[in-house]
C-alpha cells in the first residue's frame, strides 16, 4: 500500500520532536513516551547493514534497548534531514546524525538512510542503512 503525505509528515514531525526533546529521553520514561507518540507498539527496527551493530529490535522493549545502545553513549544527538519523501511503498529519510561521545568535545557525524514502513499512521518498521544510496535502493525495491 502506498504511503500518504500524512505518513511522510508524521516521520518529519518525529525527527523534529527527537531534536527538540532530547533531554526528555534521559530516562526510560522519556524514551517510552517518545516511542508511544511516534511508533506502532509492535515496531521492528533493523540495522540492515549491521551498523552500528548487527541487531534487530521489536516492540516497546526493543525500542528502549535500541535507543540505549545507539544513543546512550552520546550527548547532543541530533538529526539533520537531507531528504524525506515517499519512495515506493516506504518513507525514506536521508539524514546526517551527529553527536558527541559523553564527556568529549569532538562531534561525530555520519550519513545514514532510514526506510520506514507505516501502519495506521504510525512508524511500524525502520531499516537503518549506512549511507544514503543503500536506503534508496532498498526503498525502490518495494515499489
Question: How would you describe each model-predicted region?
Answer:
Residues 1-33, 37-41, 138-143:
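Short, low-complexity N-terminal intrinsically disordered segments enriched in polar/charged residues
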Residues 1-6, 68-143:
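A beta-strand edge to alpha-helix "cap/lid" segment located at domain peripheries
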Residues 30-90:
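A solvent-exposed, acidic/Ser-Thr-rich amphipathic alpha-helical stretch
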Amino acid at each position: 500500500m502506498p504511503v500518504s503525505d500524512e505518513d511522510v509528515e508524521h516521520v518529519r514531525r518525529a525527527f523534529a520532536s527527537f531534536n527538540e526533546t532530547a533531554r526528555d529521553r534521559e530516562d526510560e520514561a522519556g524514551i517510552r513516551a517518545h516511542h508511544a507518540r511516534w511508533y506502532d507498539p509492535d515496531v521492528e527496527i533493523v540495522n540492515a547493514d549491521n551498523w552500528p551493530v548487527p541487531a534487530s529490535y521489536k516492540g516497546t522493549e526493543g525500542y528502549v534497548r535500541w535507543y540505549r545502545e545507539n544513543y546512550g553513549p552520546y550527548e547532543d544527538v541530533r538529526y539533520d534531514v537531507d531528504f524525506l519523501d515517499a519512495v515506493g511503498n516506504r518513507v525514506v529519510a536521508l539524514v546526517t546524525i551527529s553527536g558527541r561521545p559523553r564527556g568529549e568535545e569532538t562531534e561525530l557525524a555520519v550519513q545514514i538512510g532510514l526506510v520506514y514502513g507505516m501502519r495506521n499512521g504510525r512508524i511500524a518498521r525502520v531499516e537503518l542503512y549506512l549511507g544514503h544510496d543503500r536506503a534508496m535502493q532498498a526503498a525502490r525495491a518495494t515499489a
